[in-house]
Amino acid sequence: MNETTPLLLRAARGEHVERPPVWMMRQAGRYMKVYRDLRDNHPSFRERSENPDLSYEISMQPFTAFQPDGVILFSDILTPLPGMGINFDIVESKGPLINDPIRSLKQVKDLKPLQPEESMSFVGEVLGRLRESVGNKAAVLGFVGAPWTLAAYVVEGKSSKNYAVIKAMAFQEPELLHQLLNHFAESIANYLSYQIQSGAQVVQMFDSWAGQLSPQDYDEFAAPYQQKVVNLVKEKHPDTPMILYISGSAGVLERMGQTGVDIVSLDWTVDMADGLKRLPQSVGVQGNVDPGLLFGTPDAIRSRIVDVVKKAKGRKHILNLGHGILPGTPEENARVFFEAGKNVNELIKVSS
């Protein structure tokens, strides 16, 4: 066993590992009492995610509690926007609000190139502190929102159920949208490189809303910009594993595997065995336990983890949920998830 490289990083690189590493999307958050207590004292989400002391403390909360194999930066996919000249706020229970939605060519042309070391130095500070704190016990993960999802937020101005405004732009003014997406792709690639230089060992790109696109529109408005981000980052950091996650990805799974990422994160609506058949052998998988299962019994959680891990055997696999952990999830069930992931080899023997 290689003691000097974290398990998750070895797995993401495709090295032989003793078990799949385990972490959870949104593992730092509202389901944890320590987070809710901190939130009561610091009610502004932007303060919690942009104050380096708070972001560091929150990022470390699940590591202190559960010792996952990955520690992800506590931040938000919209955090880079002010550095490009787009102001936003996150309102509890309502989500993000963009003060001045991007709807015109002038607004796109007025956007600033992102210089993360100037506008987001707090991110670099937190990542460096996380690396120092967890050492080789866990891999430090960075993340970004993909261009389509960022565009969906800034064009709509808020979360949306049907994405009518950005789809109207896509089908009426496609060149305008392409300019916006290209700006985001270049800025996000720059931001990811900054995260890697600051200490992130694995990075994940969330294209949360790309699952709202038809396959042909995914090919035009999402995939090329995912690929551009991957290519720009890999030019500078060829050895840093990259993960792509899309919520509701069943219709575009094969396309995700062609973007150049190292790992595709599956949501829980795709059976792990089926998902593997639909992806190239060289592409690893992450996932894909239904987060709703964590409201169930410990035995149900263990049984599903065994099922997922057995189906992924022989491929590079990172055990995770198929979406972020849900608010209200019992903390003890999160503990069961992590412990079952770490003891999965024994659980598989018992189940055979």
UniProtKB/Swiss-Prot annotation:
GO cellular component, one term: cytoplasm
Site-annotated residues for Transition state stabilizer: D76
Catalytic activity reported: uroporphyrinogen III + 4 H(+) = coproporphyrinogen III + 4 CO2
Source organism (scientific name): Prochlorococcus marinus (strain NATL1A)
Location(s) in or outside the cell: Cytoplasm
PROSITE patterns on file: UROD_1, UROD_2
Homology family: Belongs to the uroporphyrinogen decarboxylase family.
Broad enzyme group: lyase
Record-level Gene Ontology MF annotations: uroporphyrinogen decarboxylase activity
Pathway note: Porphyrin-containing compound metabolism; protoporphyrin-IX biosynthesis; coproporphyrinogen-III from 5-aminolevulinate: step 4/4
Binding, substrate: R26, Q27, A28, G29, R30, D76, Y153, S208, H323
Name recorded for this polypeptide: Uroporphyrinogen decarboxylase
Pfam families recorded: URO-D
